[in-house]
Amino acid sequence: MHSLEVVELTFHGRGPYSFTIGGGECLGLAGPSGAGKTLLLRALADLDPHGGRISLGPLVCDQVPAPLWRRTVGMLPAESLWWYDRVGDHFVDFDRIPEQDLAMLGFDSSVRDWQISRLSSGEKQRLAILRLLQNRPRALLLDEPTASLDADNIGHVEELLTGYRREQGIPMLWVSHDPDQLERVAGRRLAMTADGRLLAGEA
């Protein structure tokens, strides 16, 4: 199990930030809108320019090709992008999705042929989670993964993501505005203040 180590991270005039997320650990991150939580995730995923050092075990962000880092450190944005109008075309191999994972999130194999344009925001989010997990990331960065879901699906998503983290022994950073959710899924929490400082504990 590898830890995600962040040392003196800076981006968009913010930071420096230093913290470690252990292998198999979920770190929760709370804070007001506009504080910079999404910017932090984007820097960790190497989607935005940044300074400092980010490493996952032997992999160092600035020393490997960006596509490799982004496959290894998977980020789920608050709103995922969809390029085609058929669900199955967004998956490397739709047939490799475990049937129990599809069922847990309220789908079966017929969803492969559904049209993206007819999906609700909640259906898109649940499918985005399945798409991300199919890549078998070795760390997860989650930007409010259940914000568009009802209570039942929130529970199913929490169960699926927590199960993946534990089975794979990966570090996970989970951003949420719901303190009760972070109490359920995260063993440790940080809070980002309105001026961008990171503090231990609740926001």
For the regions a protein language model found, what residue spans apply to each?
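ABC ATPase NBD coupling module
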Residues: 60-74
